[in-house]
Protein backbone atom coordinates (compact mmCIF):
# COMPACT_ATOMS: atom_id res chain seq x y z
CA UNK A 1 0.00 0.00 0.00
CA UNK A 2 1.39 3.38 -1.05
CA UNK A 3 1.37 6.35 1.35
CA UNK A 4 -1.11 9.11 0.53
CA UNK A 5 1.51 11.72 1.40
CA UNK A 6 5.17 11.53 0.36
CA UNK A 7 6.43 14.49 2.37
CA UNK A 8 4.79 15.68 5.60
CA UNK A 9 5.33 18.16 8.36
CA UNK A 10 4.13 17.01 11.77
CA UNK A 11 3.15 19.78 14.20
CA UNK A 12 3.29 18.71 17.84
CA UNK A 13 2.28 20.83 20.79
CA UNK A 14 4.89 21.24 23.48
CA UNK A 15 2.39 19.83 25.97
CA UNK A 16 2.44 16.56 24.02
CA UNK A 17 5.99 16.03 25.29
CA UNK A 18 4.95 16.54 28.90
CA UNK A 19 2.71 13.47 29.02
CA UNK A 20 0.62 13.13 32.17
CA UNK A 21 2.95 15.50 34.00
CA UNK A 22 1.31 18.41 32.18
CA UNK A 23 4.51 20.46 32.06
CA UNK A 24 8.19 19.93 31.39
CA UNK A 25 9.49 17.01 29.32
CA UNK A 26 8.63 13.39 30.06
CA UNK A 27 11.28 11.28 28.34
CA UNK A 28 9.22 8.05 28.09
CA UNK A 29 6.43 10.06 26.42
CA UNK A 30 8.87 11.60 23.95
CA UNK A 31 10.30 8.16 23.20
CA UNK A 32 6.82 6.76 22.52
CA UNK A 33 6.08 9.58 20.05
CA UNK A 34 9.49 9.14 18.42
CA UNK A 35 8.90 5.40 18.03
CA UNK A 36 5.64 6.03 16.18
CA UNK A 37 7.27 8.61 13.91
CA UNK A 38 10.15 6.22 13.22
CA UNK A 39 7.70 3.49 12.20
CA UNK A 40 6.16 5.84 9.62
CA UNK A 41 9.60 6.92 8.44
CA UNK A 42 10.48 3.33 7.54
CA UNK A 43 7.82 3.45 4.80
CA UNK A 44 9.89 6.04 2.92
CA UNK A 45 7.81 9.09 3.82
CA UNK A 46 9.88 12.25 4.20
CA UNK A 47 9.21 13.87 7.57
CA UNK A 48 9.82 17.27 9.14
CA UNK A 49 8.71 18.34 12.61
CA UNK A 50 7.76 21.56 14.36
CA UNK A 51 7.22 21.37 18.12
CA UNK A 52 5.67 24.07 20.27
CA UNK A 53 7.16 25.20 23.55
CA UNK A 54 4.10 25.49 25.78
CA UNK A 55 5.30 22.72 28.09
CA UNK A 56 8.22 24.93 29.10
CA UNK A 57 7.14 28.53 28.54
CA UNK A 58 4.26 30.68 27.31
CA UNK A 59 5.09 34.14 26.06
CA UNK A 60 1.66 35.77 26.17
CA UNK A 61 0.93 35.13 29.88
CA UNK A 62 4.45 36.30 30.72
CA UNK A 63 3.84 39.49 28.73
CA UNK A 64 0.46 39.95 30.44
CA UNK A 65 2.27 39.72 33.78
CA UNK A 66 4.53 42.61 32.79
CA UNK A 67 7.43 41.03 30.88
CA UNK A 68 8.44 42.65 27.62
CA UNK A 69 6.56 40.74 24.90
CA UNK A 70 9.53 40.48 22.55
CA UNK A 71 11.78 39.05 25.27
CA UNK A 72 8.99 36.69 26.35
CA UNK A 73 8.64 35.38 22.80
CA UNK A 74 12.38 34.88 22.41
CA UNK A 75 12.37 32.91 25.65
CA UNK A 76 9.64 30.70 24.18
CA UNK A 77 11.70 30.13 21.05
CA UNK A 78 14.49 28.73 23.21
CA UNK A 79 11.95 26.35 24.74
CA UNK A 80 11.11 24.99 21.29
CA UNK A 81 14.81 24.31 20.70
CA UNK A 82 14.98 22.30 23.93
CA UNK A 83 12.02 20.23 22.76
CA UNK A 84 13.57 19.79 19.31
CA UNK A 85 16.86 18.51 20.74
CA UNK A 86 15.11 16.02 23.02
CA UNK A 87 12.94 14.72 20.17
CA UNK A 88 15.93 14.45 17.83
CA UNK A 89 17.80 12.41 20.42
CA UNK A 90 14.85 10.02 20.78
CA UNK A 91 14.54 9.62 17.01
CA UNK A 92 18.28 8.86 16.80
CA UNK A 93 17.71 6.23 19.49
CA UNK A 94 15.35 4.46 17.06
CA UNK A 95 17.93 4.56 14.29
CA UNK A 96 16.56 7.57 12.41
CA UNK A 97 19.16 10.02 11.12
CA UNK A 98 17.85 13.37 12.37
CA UNK A 99 18.89 17.01 12.08
CA UNK A 100 17.78 20.01 14.13
CA UNK A 101 17.68 23.35 12.34
CA UNK A 102 17.02 26.58 14.22
CA UNK A 103 15.84 29.96 12.97
CA UNK A 104 18.16 31.60 15.51
CA UNK A 105 21.80 30.54 14.96
CA UNK A 106 23.22 28.41 17.77
CA UNK A 107 25.88 26.46 15.94
CA UNK A 108 27.10 24.47 18.93
CA UNK A 109 23.81 22.59 19.25
CA UNK A 110 22.05 22.73 15.86
CA UNK A 111 22.32 23.73 12.23
CA UNK A 112 21.02 27.14 11.16
CA UNK A 113 17.80 26.95 9.14
CA UNK A 114 18.76 26.86 5.47
CA UNK A 115 15.98 25.77 3.14
CA UNK A 116 18.22 24.06 0.59
CA UNK A 117 20.00 22.09 3.28
CA UNK A 118 16.68 21.06 4.84
CA UNK A 119 15.49 19.79 1.46
CA UNK A 120 18.69 17.80 0.97
CA UNK A 121 18.29 16.21 4.39
CA UNK A 122 14.74 15.16 3.51
CA UNK A 123 15.84 13.78 0.15
CA UNK A 124 18.50 11.75 1.98
CA UNK A 125 15.75 10.29 4.18
CA UNK A 126 16.69 12.27 7.27
CA UNK A 127 14.09 13.75 9.58
CA UNK A 128 14.43 17.50 10.12
CA UNK A 129 13.20 19.14 13.33
CA UNK A 130 12.72 22.90 13.05
CA UNK A 131 13.29 24.91 16.22
CA UNK A 132 13.16 28.55 17.39
CA UNK A 133 10.01 29.37 15.44
CA UNK A 134 10.68 31.65 12.48
CA UNK A 135 13.19 33.61 14.53
CA UNK A 136 10.94 36.61 15.11
CA UNK A 137 8.58 37.50 17.98
CA UNK A 138 4.80 37.63 17.62
CA UNK A 139 4.67 34.56 15.35
CA UNK A 140 3.29 31.27 16.68
CA UNK A 141 4.67 27.80 16.10
CA UNK A 142 1.51 27.16 14.06
CA UNK A 143 2.68 29.87 11.68
CA UNK A 144 6.15 28.30 11.75
CA UNK A 145 4.63 24.96 10.75
CA UNK A 146 2.68 26.49 7.86
CA UNK A 147 5.67 28.49 6.64
CA UNK A 148 8.15 25.62 6.82
CA UNK A 149 5.63 23.26 5.18
CA UNK A 150 5.32 25.71 2.28
CA UNK A 151 9.09 26.14 2.03
CA UNK A 152 9.82 22.40 1.93
CA UNK A 153 6.81 21.79 -0.35
CA UNK A 154 5.15 19.37 2.06
CA UNK A 155 2.01 17.58 0.90
CA UNK A 156 0.33 17.99 4.27
CA UNK A 157 0.64 19.31 7.79
CA UNK A 158 -0.32 16.72 10.40
CA UNK A 159 -1.67 18.55 13.45
CA UNK A 160 -1.14 15.91 16.12
CA UNK A 161 -3.43 16.96 18.96
CA UNK A 162 -3.21 15.90 22.58
CA UNK A 163 -6.51 14.07 23.20
CA UNK A 164 -8.50 15.92 20.50
CA UNK A 165 -9.75 13.76 17.62
CA UNK A 166 -10.60 16.48 15.11
CA UNK A 167 -12.28 19.83 14.60
CA UNK A 168 -15.67 20.56 16.18
CA UNK A 169 -18.17 23.39 15.86
CA UNK A 170 -17.95 23.85 19.64
CA UNK A 171 -15.77 22.62 22.48
CA UNK A 172 -16.79 18.95 22.92
CA UNK A 173 -15.60 19.05 26.54
CA UNK A 174 -18.14 21.78 27.29
CA UNK A 175 -20.92 21.07 24.78
CA UNK A 176 -22.38 17.56 24.55
CA UNK A 177 -24.02 18.50 21.23
CA UNK A 178 -20.76 19.55 19.56
CA UNK A 179 -20.47 18.18 16.01
CA UNK A 180 -17.19 16.96 14.54
CA UNK A 181 -16.28 17.94 10.99
CA UNK A 182 -14.83 15.21 8.78
CA UNK A 183 -13.80 17.68 6.07
CA UNK A 184 -13.50 21.43 5.75
CA UNK A 185 -11.98 23.90 3.33
CA UNK A 186 -9.37 26.39 4.51
CA UNK A 187 -11.82 29.13 3.56
CA UNK A 188 -14.52 27.65 5.80
CA UNK A 189 -12.09 27.45 8.71
CA UNK A 190 -11.25 31.13 8.37
CA UNK A 191 -14.88 32.18 7.78
CA UNK A 192 -16.19 30.20 10.78
CA UNK A 193 -13.36 31.38 13.00
CA UNK A 194 -12.43 27.81 13.94
CA UNK A 195 -9.32 27.85 16.10
CA UNK A 196 -7.30 25.09 14.45
CA UNK A 197 -4.36 27.38 13.76
CA UNK A 198 -4.04 31.13 14.02
CA UNK A 199 -5.26 33.18 11.05
CA UNK A 200 -1.77 33.72 9.62
CA UNK A 201 -1.07 29.98 9.59
CA UNK A 202 -4.48 29.16 8.07
CA UNK A 203 -4.00 31.71 5.29
CA UNK A 204 -0.50 30.40 4.53
CA UNK A 205 -1.84 26.85 4.27
CA UNK A 206 -4.68 27.95 2.00
CA UNK A 207 -2.48 30.07 -0.27
CA UNK A 208 0.03 27.24 -0.70
CA UNK A 209 -2.59 24.49 -1.14
CA UNK A 210 -1.33 22.42 1.79
CA UNK A 211 -3.67 19.84 3.32
CA UNK A 212 -4.12 19.98 7.07
CA UNK A 213 -5.10 16.86 9.02
CA UNK A 214 -6.16 17.29 12.66
CA UNK A 215 -6.17 14.06 14.67
CA UNK A 216 -5.66 12.55 18.11
CA UNK A 217 -2.02 11.63 18.61
CA UNK A 218 -2.77 9.76 21.84
CA UNK A 219 -4.11 6.77 19.92
CA UNK A 220 -1.22 4.57 18.83
CA UNK A 221 -0.82 4.20 15.08
CA UNK A 222 -2.75 7.32 14.12
CA UNK A 223 0.16 9.04 12.37
CA UNK A 224 0.57 5.99 10.13
CA UNK A 225 -3.19 5.84 9.50
CA UNK A 226 -3.22 9.45 8.31
CA UNK A 227 -0.15 9.02 6.12
CA UNK A 228 -1.66 5.98 4.41
CA UNK A 229 -4.97 7.71 3.73
CA UNK A 230 -7.26 6.28 6.38
CA UNK A 231 -9.90 8.90 7.11
CA UNK A 232 -9.55 9.84 10.75
CA UNK A 233 -9.83 13.21 12.40
CA UNK A 234 -10.60 16.24 10.24
CA UNK A 235 -9.05 17.01 6.86
CA UNK A 236 -8.80 20.65 5.81
CA UNK A 237 -7.94 21.41 2.20
CA UNK A 238 -8.80 23.85 -0.57
CA UNK A 239 -11.37 21.40 -1.88
CA UNK A 240 -13.59 19.15 0.22
CA UNK A 241 -13.12 15.50 -0.73
CA UNK A 242 -16.03 13.58 -2.24
UniProtKB/Swiss-Prot annotation:
It is found in: Cytoplasm. It catalyses: UMP + ATP = UDP + ADP. Gene3D superfamilies: Acetylglutamate kinase-like (3.40.1160.10). It comes from the Bacteria. UMP binds at residues 53, 73, 134-141. Pathway: Pyrimidine metabolism; CTP biosynthesis via de novo pathway; UDP from UMP (UMPK route): step 1/1. Signal peptide: none annotated. Keywords: Allosteric enzyme, ATP-binding, Cytoplasm, Kinase, Nucleotide-binding, Pyrimidine biosynthesis, Transferase. Allosterically activated by GTP. Inhibited by UTP. GO terms for molecular function: ATP binding; UMP kinase activity. It is an enzyme of class 2 (transferase). Residues 19-24 are annotated as: Involved in allosteric activation by GTP. ATP binds at residues 11-14, 54, 58, 162, 168, 171. GO terms for cellular component: cytoplasm. GO terms for biological process: 'de novo' CTP biosynthetic process; UDP biosynthetic process. Its EC number is 2.7.4.22. PANTHER family: URIDYLATE KINASE, URIDYLATE KINASE PUMPKIN, CHLOROPLASTIC. Catalyzes the reversible phosphorylation of UMP to UDP. Belongs to the UMP kinase family. Homohexamer. This is Uridylate kinase. The gene is pyrH.
